[in-house]
């Protein structure tokens, strides 16, 4: 009887762990500067997409010169992902289609620091963060900062100055 009880306790303890779903993730990046770290990180993320639910890739200014090339670099990495996707799917069917990822590429704040935070300074990226948070999904949304956080700051500023501001933690 003790053995059966022990087995049942173990099953009850492990089932929630096995049932956990992927982590929701948005990445902010200053990709395209002189440091290749974000390109390397993005390639690594692409091969891990079976284990996370990517909800956005937001290019933004940090401290490097910002231009229109960031989205093209991101899309180049997604193109490379698309090339190897058939091989990745052989190992795990949960890899998302490249077009789904392309739709998540957004542009964030065009200037560094707090210069782009405040009234009328919303960006495609800050709006995307708000939209992702507002999804009907009980899982937490993780935001990985590979660059500055001013796009997230703008999203938080906007929500904190809206009718829902008192609910922002």
How should these model regions be labeled?
Residues 1-21:
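Bacterial Sec-dependent N-terminal signal peptides
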Residues 20-169:
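N-terminal acidic, glycine/proline-rich low-complexity segments
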């Amino acid at each position: 009887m003790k053995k059966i009880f022990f087995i049942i306790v173990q099953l009850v303890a492990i089932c929630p762990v096995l049932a956990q779903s992927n982590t929701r993730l948005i990445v902010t990046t200053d990709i395209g500067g002189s440091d290749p770290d974000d390109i390397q990180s993005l390639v690594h993320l692409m091969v891990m997409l079976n284990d996370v639910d990517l909800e956005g890739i937001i290019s933004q200014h940090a401290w490097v010169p910002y231009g229109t090339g960031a989205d093209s670099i991101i899309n180049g990495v997604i193109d490379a992902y698309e090339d190897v996707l058939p091989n990745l799917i052989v190992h795990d069917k949960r890899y998302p289609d490249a077009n789904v990822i392309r739709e998540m590429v957004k542009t964030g704040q065009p200037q560094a620091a707090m210069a782009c935070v405040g009234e009328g300074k919303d960006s495609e990226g800050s709006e995307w963060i708000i939209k992702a948070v507002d999804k009907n999904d009980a899982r937490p949304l993780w935001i990985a900062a590979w660059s500055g956080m001013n796009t997230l700051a703008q999203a938080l500023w906007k929500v904190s100055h809206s009718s829902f501001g008192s609910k922002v933690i």
